[in-house]
Every structure is written in structure tokens, then in C-alpha cells.
Regions:
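N-terminal "arm"/small-domain region of PLP-dependent enzymes with the aminotransferase-like
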Residues: 1-33
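Conserved PLP-enzyme active-site core in the AAT-like
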Residues: 3, 10, 14, 42, ...
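Conserved N-terminal alpha-helix of the aminotransferase class I/II PLP-enzyme fold
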Residues: 23-70, 89, 93, 97-99
Length: 176
């Protein structure tokens, strides 16, 4: 029997390297054991330089959507004002999650296939004239291939309101 392994270029699932497939065949370690605590501690320490963080790293064993939901629920309260930048399917998913839990969801629509224009977005925030707790966006809106200027946006948001949370669904290169 011949085994075919397709080349997957989607956001998930992705191909698993042979070394990891081999490691999966090792004996299981109990998640409440001392061995597991040591493995987890080593993993957390090893992830800090990968993400360029001095802060604690959290591992969530869930889908990307669950991580988006967890980030929202741990940043803002139900009566806070939050802003979602929607420029494709994943921004729309952020919006759907937000509308499930929050009373004051402000949606900043960007034409699908276009990146957010930082100055226009800051003008939008000023016109809202409400205390915004958090802004949510994506580094790369995978559904359209658009990369948002999150570094510039992060700096502009900090200048606008230093207490504002800026949550980016993306990789370590997109962190401000």
C-alpha cells in the first residue's frame, strides 16, 4: 500500500514533520505527573524566545477560533466598548464572537482585499466618542491574503489611548 501525504498550505491542518510523528509513538505521560510538569515547564521556557516575549506564555489546546474567543473573554467585560476590524472571513469571525458576548461591539469594515488605513481608523475611533477597551484585528486576513499594518496601527493606538488593548490574531512578527 502506498501512502500519499498531500502538501497542505491552508491555515490548518498543516503537515506534521516526521520527527513529531515519531514522538507521538512514545509512551504517554500523565498530565498530572511530575514528568509532565517538567516537560510543560521546559516548553513554556522554550516558547518565550520563539515569540520574543519576557512574559509568561500560555498554551491553549484548541482551535484558532477558541483562542480568539479566549482572548476576547479575558480582555474585556460584557459592557465594555470593543472595536473589531473586519476585512475578510476571519475578521468576520472575530465580529461574530464579539456579538455573542458583548453589548457594545463597534465594527470597522474594510473592503475585502484591502488593508486598514491607519489614519482613517484613528479618525473612526475619535468619532466613536466612547471609551474603547480593546481593538481586535488580524495580522494577515487569510481569506483575502491582506496583511494589515499592525506595527503602525499599534503605535497609533498607543498614541491615541495608552490604556487600550490591541489584540492581533497573527504570528510573532506581527506583535507590537
Amino acid at each position: 500500500m502506498q501512502y500519499y501525504q498531500p502538501l497542505l498550505l491552508t491555515p490548518g491542518p498543516t503537515p506534521v514533520p516526521e520527527q513529531i510523528l515519531s514522538a507521538v509513538q512514545l509512551p504517554m505521560v500523565g498530565h498530572r505527573s511530575t514528568d509532565f510538569e517538567e516537560i510543560a515547564s521546559e516548553a513554556f521556557k522554550g516558547l518565550k524566545p520563539v515569540f520574543g516575549s519576557k512574559n509568561e506564555v500560555l498554551i491553549l489546546t484548541s482551535s484558532g477560533t477558541s483562542v480568539l474567543e479566549a482572548s476576547m473573554l479575558n480582555i474585556a467585560n460584557p459592557d465594555d466598548h470593543i472595536v473589531i476590524i473586519v476585512s475578510g472571513a476571519f475578521g468576520n469571525r472575530f465580529k461574530q464572537i464579539a456579538q455573542t458576548y458583548y453589548n457594545h461591539v463597534h465594527v470597522y469594515d474594510v473592503n475585502w482585499g484591502e488593508a486598514v488605513i491607519v489614519d482613517d481608523f484613528i479618525t473612526y475611533l475619535k468619532q466613536l466618542n466612547v471609551p474603547v477597551t480593546a481593538v481586535f484585528t488580524q495580522f494577515c486576513e487569510t481569506s483575502t491574503g491582506v496583511i494589515h499594518p499592525v506595527h503602525q496601527l499599534g503605535h497609533a493606538l498607543k498614541a491615541f489611548d495608552n490604556s487600550l488593548y490591541f489584540i492581533v490574531d497573527g504570528d510573532r512578527k506581527s506583535v507590537v
